[in-house]
Amino acid sequence: MVTTMDPSRISRIVAVVFVLVIQVVSGNFVFNVTHKFAGKEKQLSELKSHDSFRHARMLANIDLPLGGDSRADSIGLYFTKIKLGSPPKEYYVQVDTGSDILWVNCAPCPKCPVKTDLGIPLSLYDSKTSSTSKNVGCEDDFCSFIMQSETCGAKKPCSYHVVYGDGSTSDGDFIKDNITLEQVTGNLRTAPLAQEVVFGCGKNQSGQLGQTDSAVDGIMGFGQSNTSIISQLAAGGSTKRIFSHCLDNMNGGGIFAVGEVESPVVKTTPIVPNQVHYNVILKGMDVDGDPIDLPPSLASTNGDGGTIIDSGTTLAYLPQNLYNSLIEKITAKQQVKLHMVQETFACFSFTSNTDKAFPVVNLHFEDSLKLSVYPHDYLFSLREDMYCFGWQSGGMTTQDGADVILLGDLVLSNKLVVYDLENEVIGWADHNCSSSIKVKDGSGAAYQLGAENLISAASSVMNGTLVTLLSILIWVFHSFTS
């Protein structure tokens, strides 16, 4: 029997601080990246709302033919501070694997947000104040790649118009200017180094884009399109189009790397070609070896339906029938009385070790790649004696009615996930994300790269919420071969 409980707040939020180190032609660079929900006590409804807004964006009709798009108030889980222009000025942008451009709010913009609940200052980029700013015209190669419209003619600016699922819009022009990265010059020492990139300059935002609860200045996309930051760096010979992440939801810490990973070795599965997102083919699913029947459309190889890997989504979403079968098989192996919290989260009381009591869920992908999701991955503690399932009934379908699975940060944690756009594959391996990985630079030299708690003694209790400051190293490698 299912009963309803009053909404409860999650008692523990982990504040994650990322440090991004990039090695380009002449050295390494550093960014500080912060979790969107850092230091804030969030209701379950806020986590679900984050994903709901993101899903609307992912399934929306988009006027701009890019391999993805951006939404400043809900798109990603992490944001970073970058510098644009000359002299360089600071802007806070969200880091997202589901977006394909870097864009920031630009002056003048009467409807852009002027404040945010994230505790960061918001700024408008102004091309008039940068000595290195250049307009991007319709005749520019960058524009000809993304714009296939007769209205974009000679001597006209390369503009964009994005429409989101909730009716929000973003309009603006593309600009070419310097992004300033902090070059690592020694142990804990950096010096600025600028590199020219093309990014969107948003001047007219409407709808939810003006909301202030979690607004930032823009988006930095790590998607597959040639317009993404990683693709622009690769086109200039600075990096290979390979990146990976390893996020630890148990002990804290983790790694985000751009470049080749030598160890641990990961098995891979093909990325479905010509898709906006990181689509892969799910072939089977089981609970401790007990198979679950999959909807036929999930095995499609043409990109209709299937499974999307998206680290910017918080939870994991399944078609209704598949969700019901999964929860039924899990609770058959460990009987619990489910209660619905905030109408969508299946929760239960439990005082024993969940990893010993609950089964492992295995997802099997093309080319025999397995994703094992352990109880500590798919269950989260609402309070000391209450757990909730991170699996959600998504009801997500394509416009053609094909079922969609969306695997978010919850099931990708505690794994090294590698996105190899050079070979159009994605893969993963179970890994202790608080330890290290071995990465390879363009010369073939291998280096140990690990996550460490730079502020290990910074845990504190704020309004009953335990806030743990963590650090994550992120490395991007020079891809030249000798």
Swiss-Prot record:
Keyword flag Metal-binding: no
Cell location: Cell membrane; Cytoplasm, Cytosol
Glycosylation sites: N32, N178, N204, N226, N432, N463
Gene: A36
Name used for this protein in its record: Aspartic proteinase 36
Lipid-attached positions, GPI-anchor amidated serine: S456
Residues forming the catalytic site: D96, D310
Signal peptide: 1-27
